[in-house]
Swiss-Prot record:
Residues 37-61, 89-112 bind DNA. This is Transcription factor MYB8. It is found in: Nucleus. Its main location: nucleus. Keywords: Activator, DNA-binding, Nucleus, Repeat, Transcription, Transcription regulation. Residues 9-61, 62-116 form the HTH myb-type domain. The keyword Transcription regulation applies. Gene3D superfamilies: Homeodomain-like (1.10.10.60). One of its GO terms (cellular component) is nucleus. One of its GO terms (molecular function) is DNA binding. Transcription activator. It comes from the Eukaryota.
Amino acid sequence: MGRSPCCEKAHMNKGAWTKEEDQRLIDYIRNHGEGSWRSLPKSVGLLRCGKSCRLRWINYLRPDLKRGNFTDGEEQIIVKLHSLFGNKWSLIAGKLPGRTDNEIKNYWNTHIKRKLLNRGIDPKTHGSIIEPKTTSFHPRNEDLKSTFPGSVKLKMETSCENCASTSGTTTDEDLRLSVDCDYRYDHLDKELNLDLTLGYSPTRFVGVGSCY
């Protein structure tokens, strides 16, 4: 069998508290102390739920409540306690005399959370927020040049060395190798879209057994 409700809600006032109701609640708690919230409304003569009386006292009427803005010291305590307890506002309020759990929760959501985000701190984990790394696209020819500097030059020079005749005499084979060297040079230029005029000039057969 479940727990019975603390009051008959059909006959309860649900609007704003009046000054007379506040004073009745204050006088009763001063004389009898806090507690027994379920039976309190009937004892005081209030058409209010026991939970409503408790929240009214804790959040608005108790004499030790602090009014006004949170101090820097209180804010630091809230941040530290939140890193330990998370959103357990009642535990945090227990360490801050005069502040209510509802008041602390509202201040966290409207002020502190935004401040932490502006400082690059995750309000949930209290760790640094890591920005995702962005990847940029590089064309294939630029990627080759940056990854293997000088590789294009090495390929050119190797091709030219193969053009040189070991006999020292211009032969049909020399001419064929020279044409082949020019073809590979131009073909590599088109493939990588490189400007070969920067530092290198197109290969031409100039002298006997030489390729420049």
